[in-house]
Curated annotation (Swiss-Prot):
This is D-tagatose-1,6-bisphosphate aldolase subunit GatZ. Pathway: Carbohydrate metabolism; D-tagatose 6-phosphate degradation; D-glyceraldehyde 3-phosphate and glycerone phosphate from D-tagatose 6-phosphate: step 2/2. Forms a complex with GatY. The keyword Nucleus does not apply. InterPro entries: Aldolase_TIM, GatZ/KbaZ-like, GatZ_KbaZ_carbometab, TagBP_ald_GatZ. Pfam families: GatZ_KbaZ-like. GO terms for cellular component: plasma membrane. One of its GO terms (biological process) is phosphoenolpyruvate-dependent sugar phosphotransferase system. It comes from Escherichia coli O7:K1 (strain IAI39 / ExPEC). Belongs to the GatZ/KbaZ family. GatZ subfamily. Keywords: Galactitol metabolism. Component of the tagatose-1,6-bisphosphate aldolase GatYZ that is required for full activity and stability of the Y subunit. Could have a chaperone-like function for the proper and stable folding of GatY. When expressed alone, GatZ does not show any aldolase activity. Is involved in the catabolism of galactitol.
Amino acid sequence: MKTLIARHKAGEHIGICSVCSAHPLVIEAALAFDRNSTRKVLIEATSNQVNQFGGYTGMTPADFREFVFAIANKVGFARERIILGGDHLGPNCWQQENADAAMEKSVELVKAYVRAGFSKIHLDASMSCAGDPIPLAPETVAERAAVLCLAAESVATDCQREQLSYVIGTEVPVPGGEASAIQSVHITQVEDAANTLRTHQKAFIARGLAEALTRVIAIVVQPGVEFDHINIIHYQAQEAQALAQWIEKTKMVYEAHSTDYQTQAAYRELVRDHFAILKVGPALTFALREAVFALAQIEQELIAPENRSGCLAVIEEVMLDEPQYWKKYYRTGFHDSLLDIRYSLSDRIRYYWPHSRIKNSVETMMVNLEGVDIPLGMISQYLPKQFERIQSGELSAIPHQLIMDKIYDVLRAYRYGCAE
């Protein structure tokens, strides 16, 4: 990361896409997409997804590392080219507890990530815990971030410190996505970004972390990009010029969250304006979901009723029976809920892919379709971009490759924005 940031600060148009997903097909796509390039691939886990207690994926940081490396071995991607990052590391998972208890767990969380070899660490202590004022004072946020940084430094080896980098600050909304519809977004003001940096510098120095400050590579701000389940707020470069100019005076870049669904031209503008780390998650699993739904429609027409997977029906049944991952985000009313379950840009389906019933139904669908020749006309109907690539000889009409290429479409837009 440090080399890339140095190149950007030296004037190169270069950025990096941060792949925030634990889905094996998304990680496989991210690695396969850049297998024949010289670029590094940044893959990040969030604190609620992967933590010392397993998170909602059931994986500790060390488990996640081995999970990613196993996929890299399968793809033929050198693990030395993988950068592992931890996102929103702090009290996010334990906000219902008092600050002392939540921070104690947060310290162990950060240590677990660093011990597991994660080299990009987002120190985010912005969440209020039980008994805390809402919002927290910037000084409190910075002091808690310094405690987390101290934890990271205490377990990092000398070799690790050469690669270790920190990201500070946070954006709105908190990790997980918007819980309600959005119409506009508040762009971070320069004075707020400057205050975030100033308070963190003061807190770090007070804890003897002056050297660690040199490892702070980025600050998270809101550049004016956001999405919810039905809306996308697109980047307006002219609105972020004050931020772009301010960061030029520092040794850092910006990290932009929720950049999913922006145009490829917007990604290029964001990188030009020093939002050099672009995070993406739901857009990748949304593309996966689109591919699975398309293949399910193809299966419906090609496979005998008694042998079909019933994939789409299984997904809906499971999500309606177990609504905990979408209920507070989606619209009420049965019809609206169904539309959001299927097509929401927030893509809460991503939490359900590991469910045994859904996983088994998708596997059945894939086996069914691998055993037949999919007519080109059906691929044109349901996956038109992939049809064009089949026609030009770039792609084969194999279900797994069709899913990969659908995910590549998202990665292609980021490559356009980030490429030197």
